[in-house]
A protein has these predicted regions:
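Gly/serine-rich nucleotide phosphate-binding loop at the start of the catalytic core
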Residues: 1-4, 14-90, 96
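Anion-binding and metal-coordination hotspots
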Residues: 45-52, 63-75, 81, 85-88, ...
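Short, contiguous clusters of charged residues that form electrostatic/catalytic patches at enzyme active sites
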Residues: 53, 167-170, 202-209
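Short alpha-helical segments and helix-capping/turn motifs at coil-helix boundaries
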Residues: 54-57, 117-124, 231
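Short, conserved catalytic/metal-binding motifs centered on acidic residues
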Residues: 55-56, 70, 91, 95, ...
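Active-site-proximal, Lys/Arg-enriched surface segment
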Residues: 96-178
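A general structural motif
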Residues: 129-132, 167, 180, 214-219, ...
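An internal, acidic/charged active-site-proximal segment
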Residues: 187-282
Length: 282
């Protein structure tokens, strides 16, 4: 995250960091150039697509919480964005209109190409933990409302009995040493008729297979919580050539008791294995 202290030194540091970031995005990852190539389905195009998407991307990276606050007073943003945007800064209505029309598949492809560059530049050549590239996988809720919904929303009953609509996805990203990179995200799908909405395990298996196909090899070890202690999920990881570390919380489970018994007998205390040129002990 870039510094944003309300001091002269903080402002200067923010400007320098932002300028360096933008230079790197343009020269190495070609992100501004790719943004200009996105499809634009708007009827009125008084503000160029780039002048809308680029500020949105920057404010997401700066972790600003509310687009409405930012784009309601675009004049105040012009000086901050003068290094990357020429021309008008959009208002919130223009941002909302464009984002509702952009094809998510095009954004996903830009992200996938960015991962390709990271791999080609061997960003993770030293690994993220102990020489291995470790990636965590978990579910995250993105949005919820009792009033607004779309055909792709999941649904549930809240505490008052009202139907609540929400979006949830499974995300896979590196853990350990920086940079922390999101490899991919898989949206969970709503139920069809009497069927239940998709769970995190179904989405996780689909995401792992997709990442294996698109970015193989993308990681050495997958880290997950107890939800993913599931034979079909573990078998999916094995099929994709991945090791796994899964947290086990319930001490009453037979698996936990068996492991504890082995440690008491001094079995399984240490085991080493090789993967390619790497060696690891557990």
């Amino acid at each position: 995250m870039l510094p944003h202290k309300h001091t002269k030194e903080g402002v200067l540091n923010e400007k320098l960091a932002l300028k360096k970031l933008l230079t790197y995005m343009k020269s190495v990852y070609k992100i501004p150039q790719k943004i200009k190539g996105l499809s634009d389905e708007r009827k009125r195009k008084s503000i160029p697509l780039f002048n809308i998407v680029m500020p949105v991307l920057i404010f997401l990276m700066l972790q600003y919480e509310g687009f409405h606050t930012i784009f309601s007073a675009p004049e105040s943003m012009e000086k901050r964005l003068k290094n990357c945007i020429r021309g008008k800064i959009p208002r919130v209505d223009a941002v909302r209109d464009l984002l509702s029309r952009i094809d998510p598949k095009e954004i996903e492809e830009i992200h996938a190409q960015t991962i390709d560059v990271l791999k080609r530049n061997r960003v993770f050549r030293e690994g993220t933990i102990g020489g291995y590239v470790a990636a965590g996988i978990d579910g995250v809720e993105l949005f919820s409302s009792t009033k607004k919904s779309c055909p792709d929303c999941l649904s549930r009953k809240n505490g008052t009995g009202k139907t609540e609509y929400f979006h949830r996805s499974v995300v896979c990203m590196t853990v350990g040493k920086s940079p922390h990179v999101i490899f991919g995200q898989e949206m969970l799908k709503p139920r069809d008729g009497s069927e239940k909405d998709e769970g995190g395990l179904t989405g996780a298996k689909r995401l792992i297979r997709h990442l294996k196909k698109r970015h193989s090899p993308f990681a050495d070890v997958i880290v997950a919580d107890a939800l993913y202690l599931n034979a079909p999920f573990i078998n999916t990881l094995k099929e994709c050539g991945l090791e796994t570390v899964i947290r086990l919380k319930d001490e009453r489970r037979l698996l936990f008791q068996d492991a504890e018994s082995m440690f008491q007998r001094d079995e399984g205390r240490k085991r080493s294995f090789r993967k390619g040129k790497k060696s690891i002990e557990v």
